[in-house]
Amino acid sequence: MRAEARGGLERFCSAGKGRGLRALRPFHVGDLLFSCPAYACVLTVGERGHHCECCFARKEGLSKCGRCKQAFYCDVECQKEDWPLHKLECSSMVVLGENWNPSETVRLTARILAKQKIHPERTPSEKLLAVREFESHLDKLDNEKKDLIQSDIAALHQFYSKYLEFPDHSSLVVLFAQVNCNGFTIEDEELSHLGSAIFPDVALMNHSCCPNVIVTYKGTLAEVRAVQEIHPGDEVFTSYIDLLYPTEDRNDRLRDSYFFTCECRECTTKDKDKAKVEVRKLSSPPQAEAIRDMVRYARNVIEEFRRAKHYKSPSELLEICELSQEKMSSVFEDSNVYMLHMMYQAMGVCLYMQDWEGALKYGQKIIKPYSKHYPVYSLNVASMWLKLGRLYMGLENKAAGEKALKKAIAIMEVAHGKDHPYISEIKQEIESH
């Protein structure tokens, strides 16, 4: 495989990181470095009927599969293209009804196995890195992660054994471990979850907490654009995680999911950490121990809320958010990332409950510190401006709505590219109000 298989880029051995991607020519902010079609992808069950199962296009009037009546498509072409993969699920969904419930990871892995059988040769998604070359980090998995893989394998056999030939057990363990480390979540313009996918060439990029590129999606196509000036010889870095949090939290997440500690500029200098864990300016400032205790409380409540989402009512969830903010505000400023995390969750609950004023109130508090804590071209900041803009428009404040939507567009033109359908849709929203 030629190093220049992707124009102006090459695969190389990155010191201390293993494989990586390097620029051979300059790329300016907003430039598209490359795009990569999904090797395999799966639409999340909750988006069925809103997005095409094959190309993920969002549109009205999708046609449903005549057999299962659960998969929806743009047209006959999309349905035909998806059939070799949809047939793995179609009749099972009919037979099992409510009892058909494989996880998204299991569904994606089933599609990867089917794709490998249908298309054993290298695909256009693998110009620089093949799926079989993915890291699995098997030797680093703890018992909990190993048990999860075993239950995924059991589900794969339960739901797909009629329609798929499986490799041996140890190969399946490796494949699930590879998917866990190299899978991508496809999100829409408001960062809502649309599905999961494998993009081999995108997975070649290493991580940095000050990335020089950003990955966005156009349907099932991943696009990689520069968010900093990139010079010939520079390594191309993306971010694997949410960059809102302080260094210790980011590295905990990286170690848990990807088995490494980041040593980028942001992690070695910890320049942003003080502002991220901003403490209230009181006449008698909180002691170091009180701050440490509150950070510990914040991390615990974040985890508690994550679990509570699965079984508590919206009003109970909102109460957790409000009580935790009240407790943290005795030590933390509103701009503290742990406060922001709970405000963001509260905003999400308000949106779910259609409490537009409540959601707007939280969004207004969040946006300024978000703009400070995140990189300049951040999808988190763009999606927050977008939510605010749409809330203002819905509440008949056109001037504020237009201003917020234009701020979202300014970021998205760099991150998504000026011709992205999302941008046309937002411009249409502004004009139609």
From Swiss-Prot:
Miscellaneous comment text of the record: Although specifically expressed in cardiomyocytes, a conditional deletion in heart does not lead to any visible phenotype.
Q: Where does Zn(2+) 1 bind?
A: C52, C55, C74, C78
* Protein name, UniProt field: N-lysine methyltransferase SMYD2
From which residue to which do the MYND-type zinc fingers run? Answer: 52-90
Can you provide one Gene Ontology molecular function annotated for this UniProt record?
A: zinc ion binding
Gene for this chain: Smyd2
Q: How does it assemble?
A: Interacts (via MYND-type zinc finger) with EPB41L3. Interacts (via SET domain) with p53/TP53. Interacts with RB1 and HSP90AA1. Interacts with RNA polymerase II and HELZ. Interacts with SIN3A and HDAC1.
Where does the chain bind S-adenosyl-L-methionine? Answer: K17, G18, R19, H137, N206, H207, Y258, F259, F260
For the modification Phosphoserine, which residues carry it?
A: S283
Show the stretches that span the lipid bilayer. Answer: none
User: What is the organism of origin for this protein?
Assistant: Mus musculus (Mouse)
Q: In which broad location class does this protein mainly occur, judging by the first location in its UniProt entry?
A: cytoplasm
Described function: Protein-lysine N-methyltransferase that methylates both histones and non-histone proteins, including p53/TP53 and RB1. Specifically trimethylates histone H3 'Lys-4' (H3K4me3) in vivo. The activity requires interaction with HSP90alpha. Shows even higher methyltransferase activity on p53/TP53. Monomethylates 'Lys-370' of p53/TP53, leading to decreased DNA-binding activity and subsequent transcriptional regulation activity of p53/TP53. Monomethylates RB1 at 'Lys-860'.
